[in-house]
């Protein structure tokens, strides 16, 4: 495990750095393998970076992306991460955005659909961009969720699992589909992007103690052989 920490003066500088890194990794993937595969976090922090990335010159027809996790809501719902990605990256003409859920957001059907989709994209992600909540969750790996143990199991090969946060976050009280820890770690570049002092304090706790049950993000930060680039701004 290794951590490379990048401090930025403000959220704008953070977004610029994320966009540049995503673009660079996509260009490298296209040059070396002819295609690129991304897993992208929802939440407010990374979306300015996605808009900047979408405006960059790239052969988007050879790029596929998916959310790192999704709320089990219809694809047109305001809480849907896929909808947010579509809107942010509308200028990335040709980009294939892969959903983790069915169009109606049924949780059980979505779990099965996500696993089938991941079977078609079995290779390593070129970039996984993660966020983190003040409870230490990343993607939808929430502390206290009954399925957390399954999602953290390094031997799981299905790649995605239904998550029922307990308690449900009041701002988004929905079941989720999340990529598992092992699928998130199957990546050439892993980025964790956070803002604010409160999340910085949680990050320091997760870095200090490898306790994924308390801080699920620790499963990524302390994974053997993984290098995580942590981008932070006040």
Give the role of each language-model region.
Residues 61, 68, 75-76, 123, ...:
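Active-site histidine-anchored catalytic micro-motif
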Residues 179-182, 186-234:
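ATP/nucleoside-binding phosphotransfer catalytic cores, i.e., glycine-rich phosphate-binding loops
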Residues 34-41, 126-128:
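Short glycine-rich phosphate-binding loop at a beta-alpha junction
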Residues 134-182:
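Class I SAM-dependent methyltransferase SAM-binding "motif I" and its flanking Rossmann-like core
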Residues 1-38:
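N-terminal glycine-/serine-/threonine-rich phosphate-binding loop
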Residues 2, 61-129:
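Ligand-binding beta-strand-loop-alpha-helix segment within the catalytic cores
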Residues 40-45, 130-134, 195:
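Glycine-rich beta-strand-to-loop/alpha-helix junction loops that act as flexible
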Residues 52-60, 83-87, 143-152, 208:
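A glycine- and small-aliphatic-rich helix-loop capping segment at beta-alpha/alpha-beta transitions
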């Amino acid at each position: 495990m290794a951590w490379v920490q990048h401090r930025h003066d403000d959220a704008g500088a953070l977004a610029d750095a994320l966009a540049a890194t995503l673009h660079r990794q996509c260009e490298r993937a296209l040059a070396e393998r002819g295609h690129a595969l991304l897993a992208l976090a929802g939440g407010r922090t990374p979306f300015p970076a996605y808009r900047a990335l979408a405006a960059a010159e790239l052969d988007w027809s050879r790029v596929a992306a998916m959310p790192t996790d999704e709320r089990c809501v219809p694809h047109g719902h305001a809480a849907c991460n896929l909808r947010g990605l579509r809107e942010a990256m509308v200028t990335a003409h040709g980009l294939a955005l892969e959903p983790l859920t069915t169009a109606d957001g049924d949780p059980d059907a979505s779990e099965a659909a996500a696993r089938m989709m991941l079977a078609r994209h079995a290779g390593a992600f070129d970039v996984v961009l993660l966020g983190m909540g003040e409870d230490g969750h990343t993607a939808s790996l929430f502390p206290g969720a009954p399925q957390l143990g399954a999602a953290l199991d390094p031997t799981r090969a299905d790649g995605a699992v239904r998550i029922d946060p307990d308690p449900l976050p009041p701002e988004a009280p929905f079941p989720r589909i999340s990529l598992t820890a092992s699928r998130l770690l199957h990546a050439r570049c892993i980025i964790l992007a956070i803002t604010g002092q409160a999340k910085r304090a949680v990050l320091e706790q997760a870095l200090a103690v490898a306790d994924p049950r308390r801080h699920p993000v620790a499963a990524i930060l302390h994974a053997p052989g993984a290098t995580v680039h942590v981008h932070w701004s006040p």
